[in-house]
UniProtKB/Swiss-Prot annotation:
HAMAP family: Transcrip_reg_TACO1. It comes from Mesomycoplasma hyopneumoniae (strain J / ATCC 25934 / NCTC 10110) (Mycoplasma hyopneumoniae). It is found in: Cytoplasm. One of its GO terms (biological process) is regulation of DNA-templated transcription. GO terms for cellular component: cytosol. This is Probable transcriptional regulatory protein MHJ_0471. Keywords: Cytoplasm, DNA-binding, Transcription, Transcription regulation. Transmembrane segments: none annotated. One of its GO terms (molecular function) is DNA binding. The lineage of its organism: Bacteria, Bacillati, Mycoplasmatota, Mycoplasmoidales, Metamycoplasmataceae. PANTHER family: TRANSCRIPTIONAL REGULATORY PROTEIN YEBC-RELATED, TRANSLATIONAL ACTIVATOR OF CYTOCHROME C OXIDASE 1. InterPro entries: Integrase-like_N (IPR017856), TACO1_YebC-like_2nd/3rd_dom (IPR048300), TACO1_YebC_N (IPR049083), Transcrip_reg_TACO1-like (IPR002876), Transcrip_reg_TACO1-like_dom3 (IPR026564), YebC-like (IPR029072). It comes from the Bacteria. Gene3D superfamilies: 1.10.10.200, 3.30.70.980.
């Protein structure tokens, strides 16, 4: 069941590697603090925290950074409680649809920045917390191939709740219902002890838009501008890379 990774078309980030990692780790730290404030600091009894830690580890976030974020959420709950997640849909030029996930301690600032970003991109902001029909939420696991047998992993994944299994030259991609992701990840980890490159609950488009190279680069630059905003956690889109 080899196929092309959809994931590469959905999430896009830029910049020098060190700066990029620092930005990603900062976003994970905020998510960890919020999860601790809502459900406590024990990953065994807090599935939201357990999933975020899995995501952070998949992106090589140092253990010390994770522990520091947990301590901040635990020792200063006002920090975690003041962060709010809001989701906006919208469109960019050439009919590109986006979902923007915001995690902020200042909603007015975040919305004002988002409106400005859409204006600069000649786009149109949509409704808050309204997911367009073009997108579907799914759990996503990406695993390095290494010496893992594809058939063994595929059959095991499908038997444990996966809905789709794909592969490219270096990775296996597994899709499932969002509520299944923690259980599926844990079962795969116990059986195979693989190297996870991604553990996500994400938004996947049902329809793609493909542009020429020049306009693709323009859209990707606009998405980069969104991701540079301190309050924006993720941007999901339906632009298919040429």
């Amino acid at each position: 069941m080899a196929g092309h990774s959809k994931w590469a078309n959905i999430k896009h980030r830029k910049g020098a590697q060190d700066a990029l990692k620092a930005k990603i780790f900062n976003k994970f730290s905020k998510e960890i603090m919020v999860a601790v404030a809502k459900g406590g600091s024990d990953p065994n009894s807090n599935p939201a925290l357990r999933l975020i830690i899995s995501k952070a580890r998949a992106k090589s976030m140092p253990k010390s950074n994770i522990e520091k974020a947990i301590a901040k959420g635990e020792g200063s709950t006002s920090n975690g409680e003041n962060f709010k997640e809001i989701i906006y849909s919208g469109t960019l030029s050439h009919g590109i649809s986006v979902i923007v996930v915001i995690l902020t301690d200042n909603i007015n600032r975040a919305i004002a920045s988002l409106q400005a970003l859409f204006r600069r991109a000649n786009g149109q902001i949509g409704k808050q917390n309204s997911i367009p029909y073009l997108f579907e939420q799914k759990g996503y696991l990406e695993i390095e191939k290494n010496n893992l047998d594809e058939d063994d992993l595929m059959l095991f994944s499908l038997d444990n709740g996966a809905e789709d299994f794909q592969s490219d030259e270096t990775n296996y991609m597994i899709y499932c219902q969002p509520r299944k992701i923690s259980e599926l990840k844990n079962e795969i980890e116990k059986k195979f002890s693989p190297n996870f490159r991604a553990v996500e609950i994400s938004y996947f488009p049902n329809e793609w838009v493909e542009l020429d190279q020049e306009n693709t680069e323009k859209i990707l630059n606009q998405i980069d501008n969104f991701l540079d905003d301190e309050d924006i956690q993720n941007v999901y889109h339906n632009l298919k890379f040429a």
